[in-house]
From Swiss-Prot:
It comes from Actinobacillus succinogenes (strain ATCC 55618 / DSM 22257 / CCUG 43843 / 130Z). Signal peptide: none annotated. This is RNA polymerase-associated protein RapA. It holds the Pfam family SNF2-rel_dom. A motif (DEAH box) lies at residues 283-286. It is an enzyme of class 3 (hydrolase). ATP binds at D176, E177, V178, G179, L180, G181, K182, T183. Interacts with the RNAP. Has a higher affinity for the core RNAP than for the holoenzyme. Its ATPase activity is stimulated by binding to RNAP. Transcription regulator that activates transcription by stimulating RNA polymerase (RNAP) recycling in case of stress conditions such as supercoiled DNA or high salt concentrations. Probably acts by releasing the RNAP, when it is trapped or immobilized on tightly supercoiled DNA. Does not activate transcription on linear DNA. Probably not involved in DNA repair. GO terms for biological process: regulation of DNA-templated transcription. Belongs to the SNF2/RAD54 helicase family. RapA subfamily.
Length: 966
């Protein structure tokens, strides 16, 4: 291929991008801009999937200004084409440069292939038609971006994701309590933004300890391949890049990095700020602290990022726990114009408290007090509420229920932070199991006592070493086997033998401890174990998780390091052994959270074997008796940990001082109850109602559940694999193994590894076995598989015999599939209104369309394959007839496409105008509606209608059918 600036090419893999212009060429790469879609692509010159567009004499072409002309001659100047053309509107003859060609372009390739004997099989034609039909359905589906997640269908998560994910530029604070799925909500919002074309470049900033958890969650749950950035990665990039001033953040689209790294490395911080991202996610946002006098460095960095990144998701489980000022400051990061003054914010929040109390009364179906009616009237001052209040006093229960809901909905719309803050609590969501704790105090072995004494003589604090005595002992003698005398090991063996039918998760502090425990359990009792730690690759961890999940022949116990288990959930197990205790309440909750998730159906039993009168026992007692963190979630745990840290450290270093410790535990418990009461009193019922989604969220979950059970997905996918040439083997338990073969129609099938992959269509099985690929309409393997078919040449032409004794032999039918589409920027999301839409015609020799009378599947059952040489001869014989039928089909399609495009314009205008009117109405009563959001939506409405007016149609595929008698 010879490239030159100004040449026009199309993408073979993304023909919806329209006609591209080469803007830059060098020895290694070619850059091409696609104006119709406002997209730029860079390809390797040696393997660019591009086709040169050159027209011939007699072809009709279109100028960018819209007028058409017929090519009479072609010339070449500096490798670019010059066309001598005659305009159809005024007959003028001019020279047209190829760079001036219209960016939207149609190719009538199917008939060209047909007349050059490039005739495909009939079953491939059927596959292509079904792929087009399913592609259209998926673009219009309200479940797109929600159903493909590997997770249970939790209504409040789906509600938040749908509500936020469909916004133009979402800027929200996700503040659900621990275990309610903030990461999942953020992932679903992100996925919808990616599907809509609004987020190509994403930066996730998290604490260092959560980097791998996010990496695994994004990959396993959403099939999003993020890159982990640290100093080593940045330096490696600098070493391999030829440019001196290179920015590593420009090298990937989906990036995860730690906040600590950006803070400690000014150069990386500057580089991150110089990069254009579309969406920012910040986890553990409560670490961002602010006051009118000063802000911490973490806050200042995130503030700089939020000023230049249009979409922002902040995640925290403790929105107001660390003070109203910091809570206000986090909201200020999302909308500085709305949250401009702290005192005004406090006054406004105080104003909403009586309203929240009134909502609670409405929910309880109790009569409203005069004060509550006044509070509602103050907020809904533009409405005449007297008829509604009278209706609440009537005896008509149905009318009362309707009025109550109307009032609640109106109050939610006007809530001060309902557009930017979402918070669900366990008390509001319900459905969680109990957590039952048991502490096992064991004697400290003399071997550990001696080791501690040796350490003490070396000047170290011996009590610190007693947190992990096995590590201390092993470091002193690498050949020693601490598991031969450690009573925790004997207790664990007995425990596992007594619960052979149960799956048990054991979490250790370090990977080495987990590995050595596996050796001990296998050698002493032959207990089947899987080991899971950070030194393993993701594939190795998948295998370990699968071995543990296997209910028939799998491991009884999974031995995991604390870091290794991040991002993994083992809800099929209900027994957790903490062989080592984590250092703080947040890490403890993360460990318990491996089992305590929404969807866990059994009570969780937590076991802590520890040494009596040791720092381990002190910490266990403080967690349990002070925080009650084993048996309840403790949202104020870290605040108490920081407040009580100095006293706790004293007792950890003096574990035998029991009298003072009992008083310390009592004071901690009192403080916990006090903070818990404050949090409960501060609960915003109005906010929780808006965050929960109510019945609408339940209906959304049910709709996905119904689609999960639809056999159409399974039938289409297996047919796709079969025709492409992917080998399929039943693997049992609702799963199949698919493997590439040397006879596939394509060199590579998207997402299919050389060694094959095991897939399932069952959500519950996918949750239990993370090594399986969970196939849905949203899965990249299926989306890319459909693209593979519809963007390539598979099934573009076909010829078949119609066995029907009622028709005269030799009756000619022409089945045509046209596609009406809009080649427009992805961010407009016009596929909501006009996705690539297949229109089927079935013409007889007179040009009559029989498609309505003869359905596709009905016709398919009567067709027989035709040998390729016979098909080629037949097409040559009837070519004049086919050309005449094609001309008649074009006339029919012109009117149908016009109607379809007009309907799409009306729908777009209605939907976008309705949303504009809603936002404008709300803005009058809710300051939280941003003006830039309204202005942006109006621009989208105008641009959408303009782009839809340019929509075009093309012949995608055709099938020649000749009748024959049985």
């Amino acid at each position: 291929m010879v490239f030159a600036v100004g040449q026009r090419w199309i993408s073979e893999s993304e023909n919806n991008l329209g006609l591209g212009i080469i803007t830059e060429v060098n020895s290694r790469a070619v850059t091409i801009f696609f104006p119709a879609a406002d997209e730029t692509r860079i390809y390797a010159t040696a393997s660019a999937p591009l086709t040169r567009v050159v027209f011939n004499a007699g072809d009709m072409i279109t100028h960018q200004q819209g007028w058409q002309a017929q090519v009479t001659d072609i010339m070449v100047n500096n490798l670019t084409a010059l066309y001598l053309v005659r305009r159809t509107d005024n007959g003028e003859e001019i020279v047209l440069k190829e760079i001036d060609l219209a960016h939207q372009i149609n190719f009538s390739q199917p008939q060209d292939r047909l007349f050059t004997a490039q005739i495909d099989r009939s079953d491939r034609f059927a596959l292509r038609y079904h792929a087009l039909r399913h592609q259209q359905a998926q673009f219009k589906s309200p479940l797109r971006g929600l159903r493909g997640i590997r997770a249970g269908l939790i209504p409040h998560q789906l509600h938040i994701a749908k509500e936020v994910g469909q916004r133009l530029h979402p800027r929200v604070l996700l503040a659900d309590e621990v275990g309610l799925g903030k990461t999942i909500e953020a992932g679903m919002i992100l996925q919808q933004q990616i599907f809509a074309g609004r987020a190509d470049r994403v930066l996730i900033v998290v604490p260092e300890s959560l980097q791998h958890q996010w990496l695994v969650e994004m990959l396993r749950r959403f099939n999003l391949h993020f890159s982990l950035f640290d100093e080593e990665r940045a330096e490696d990039f600098a070493a391999t890049d030829e440019q001196e001033e290179c920015n590593p953040f420009d090298s990937e689209n989906l990036i995860i990095c730690s906040l600590d790294w950006l803070i400690s490395r000014p150069k990386r911080r500057t580089q991150a700020l110089q990069t254009q991202f579309d969406l920012l996610i910040v986890d553990e946002a409560h670490h961002l602290t602010w006051s009118p006098e000063a802000a911490n460095p973490e806050y200042q960095l995130v503030e700089s990022l939020t000023k230049q990144i249009p979409s922002v998701l902040l995640l925290t489980a403790t929105p107001e726990q660390l003070g109203q000022e910091s809570h206000f400051a986090r909201l200020k990061l999302l909308d500085a114009d709305r949250f401009y003054d702290y005192d005004a914010f406090v006054a406004e929040q105080r104003h909403y408290r009586p309203v929240a109390d009134a909502v609670q009364t409405l929910l309880a179906e109790n009569p409203l007090s005069a004060a509550e009616k006044n509070a509602i009237s103050d907020l809904l001052e533009e409405q005449d509420l007297e008829p509604l209040f009278k209706a609440l006093d009537s005896r008509n229960e149905e009318e009362k229920a309707t009025v109550r809901q109307e009032l609640i909905d109106s109050l939610i719309d006007r809530h001060g932070t309902s557009r930017v803050l979402f918070r669900n609590t366990r008390q509001g969501v319900k459905g969680f199991p109990r957590r039952i704790y048991r502490q096992i105090n064991l004697p400290l072995p003399k071997q550990y006592i001696n080791a501690v004494r040796v350490v003490g003589r070396l000047g170290k604090n011996p009590e610190d070493e007693l947190f992990y005595p096995e590590r201390l002992f092993q470091n002193m003698d690498q050949n020693a086997k601490w598991w031969d005398f450690d009573p925790r090991v004997e207790w664990l063996i007995t425990f596992l033998k007594n619960h052979r039918a149960e799956k048990v998760l054991v979490i250790c502090r370090q990977a080495q401890t987990a590995v050595q425990l596996e050796q001990a359990l296998r050698a002493k009792e032959g207990i089947r174990c899987a080991v899971f730690h950070e030194r393993l690759s993701i594939i190795e961890r998948d295998r370990a998780a699968a071995y543990f999940a296997d209910q028939e022949n799998g491991a009884q116990v999974l031995l995991s390091s604390a870091i290794g288990s991040e991002g993994r959930n083992f809800q099929f197990a209900c027994r957790l052994v903490l062989f080592n205790l984590p250092e703080n309440p947040d890490l403890l909750e993360q460990c318990i959270g491996r089992l305590d998730r929404i969807g866990q159906r059994r009570d969780i039993r937590i076991y802590v074997p520890c040494f009596a009168d040791s720092p381990q026992a002190v910490l266990a007692d403080w967690f349990h008796q002070g925080l009650n963190a084993f048996e309840e979630i403790c949202p104020m745990g870290m605040a108490l940990f920081e407040k009580c840290g100095q006293n706790l450290q004293y007792f950890l270093q003096n574990p035998t001082e029991s009298a003072g410790f009992e008083m310390f535990l009592k004071k901690t418990a009192e403080l916990r109850l006090q903070l818990k009461a404050e949090l409960e009193n501060g609960r915003d019922r109005l906010l929780e109602l808006n965050s929960n989604g109510g019945e609408a969220a339940q209906r959304l979950a049910e709709a996905i559940r119904v689609e999960d059970n639809d056999t159409e997905l399974v039938n289409f996918t297996l047919n796709l694999f079969d025709i492409i040439g992917v080998e399929q083997e039943d693997s049992g338990e609702k799963s199949i193994v698919i493997t590439p073969t040397g006879t596939m129609l394509v060199p590579d099938f998207p997402g299919l590894k050389e060694e094959g992959v095991t897939v399932t269509f069952d959500r519950e099985l996918a949750l239990a076995r993370e090594e399986l690929e969970f196939l849905t309409w949203d899965h990249p393997m299926l989306r890319n598989g459909i693209d593979l078919v519809v963007s390539g040449d598979i099934g573009k032409t076909a010829a078949s015999l119609l066995v029907n004794n009622k028709l005269p032999t030799g009756t000619l039918l022409l089945e045509l599939i046209y596609v009406v589409e809009s080649q427009s920027p992805k961010g407009l999301q016009l596929n909501r209104f006009l996705p690539p839409t297949p229109i089927r015609l079935l013409l007889d020799g007179k040009g009559q369309d029989l498609a309505a009378q003869v359905g596709f599947n009905r016709l398919e059952k009567q067709l027989k394959p035709m040998a390729k040489n016979m098909a080629s001869k037949m097409v040559k014989m009837v070519r004049p007839n086919i050309e005449k039928m094609l001309s008649m089909a074009e006339q029919l399609m012109r009117e149908r496409a016009k109607t379809l495009i007009g309907d799409a314009q009306q729908q777009a205008d209605f939907v976008l105008s309705h949303e504009l009117n809603r936002l404008n109405g709300l803005k009058r009563v809710n300051k939280n509606i941003r003006q830039d959001e309204i202005d942006g939506l109006e621009k989208i409405r105008i641009r959408s209608l303009s782009e839809l007016a340019k929509a075009s149609w093309r012949l995608d595929c055709l099938r020649v059918i000749v009748s024959n008698r049985a």
